[in-house]
Amino acid sequence: MSNLRITKRRFLKSLTGVALTACGGSLKHFSFDTYSKMDANLGLELTFYGVGCFGIRCRGSQILTDPFFTYLPLMKVAFGTVLPDPKQVDPYITELQDVAAMLVGHAHYDHNLDLPYIAEKLHKNSYVLGSKTLKHTFAPNNLPTPFVVMNDRVATQETLGEWWVHPNKKFRVLPILSAHPNQYLFFHLYKKNISEDRTTVPKKVHHYQEGMTFAFLIDFLNTEGQPDVRVYVQSSSTGLPMGAFPKSILDEKSIDIACVAMDCANKKMNGEVSVIDEYPATHTFFCHYEDFFRTKEQVPKEIVKVDLPKAKEFFLDTSKQAFYFPKADARFIL
């Protein structure tokens, strides 16, 4: 009887959680930012694949954040299997084969579902950077790519943290302690840390527990090993001090590009100080605004916590920074 109660509770929790994130308005007439070639002269190509997934190519290396291409219907996520769909991922594989690192902000399925499938297609010098929970989650997948646990390397507002440098010496990554907000009101789902390897491949939404949440600072390096282009990524945020790092790091190099969740935009729109203010970037791209229970072929919808038209109007009023609301699969040359 106890197992039945647990199953029922999990059933209701899954249904409630996924339903709440799928209740936003239509974006049929929203003016997204699409392909753009800018005059920044950074030598960087940025592709927004959707949710928190960006391809960032610079100085001969590509980094992929939060690898998620498989959009599954709400009912399947709530009650069925949650596994990569090759039909949705394969169209992108060719442009991902030079990925040197996959960075995962936290271990919910919408930030890493396609990681095992993509990892099989990558070269031997590609790495996965993420939490202990993520590593334990995918242990039974026997990933062919080396896994770098970032928990003990995190920077905070007061601590410098520890950079990870790719063996090719072309880029380095600093994990920054962040946090995941409630999905809606007081609902916060699948927030456990996992301390032991799973024995079976994850295939249900509750198998993807949150674990530690990160933001990342990415430096593409010049031939002397100094930061040439700097990118900040935060795909989940509860607001400062989460996502903050010592400002002395900015003495070395300011931030050229920021890829941040709509939570950051909402904080600023509500009059709160956000990472957008404290760690300004020349170019800021907003992400994780869409209902990902709909395929890319369908008319996009925003999630319940987001008002994209209002946000775009708000951020157009600023002249100090450039802000973008990219459409899925939009590519930007900077």
State each model region's role.
Residues 52, 72, 107-113, 135-138, ...:
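Active-site environment of divalent metal-dependent phosphoester hydrolases
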Residues 127, 135, 139-168, 272-334:
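Binuclear metal-ion centers of metallo-dependent hydrolases, dominated by the metallo-beta-lactamase
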Residues 201-278:
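Active-site-proximal loop/helix segments of hydrolase catalytic cores
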Residues 59-104, 108, 113-121, 183-201, ...:
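Pre-active-site segment of Zn-dependent metallo-hydrolases
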Residues 65-66, 99-107, 129-131, 232-237, ...:
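Active-site neighborhood of phospho(di)ester-bond hydrolases with catalytic His/Asp-centered motifs
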Residues 146-223, 227-229, 320-334:
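Flexible, acidic/histidine-containing loops and adjacent segments that form or flank the divalent-metal
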Residues 2-4, 10-31:
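N-terminal export signals
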Residues 90-186:
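Active-site HxH/HxHxD metal-binding segment of metal-dependent hydrolases
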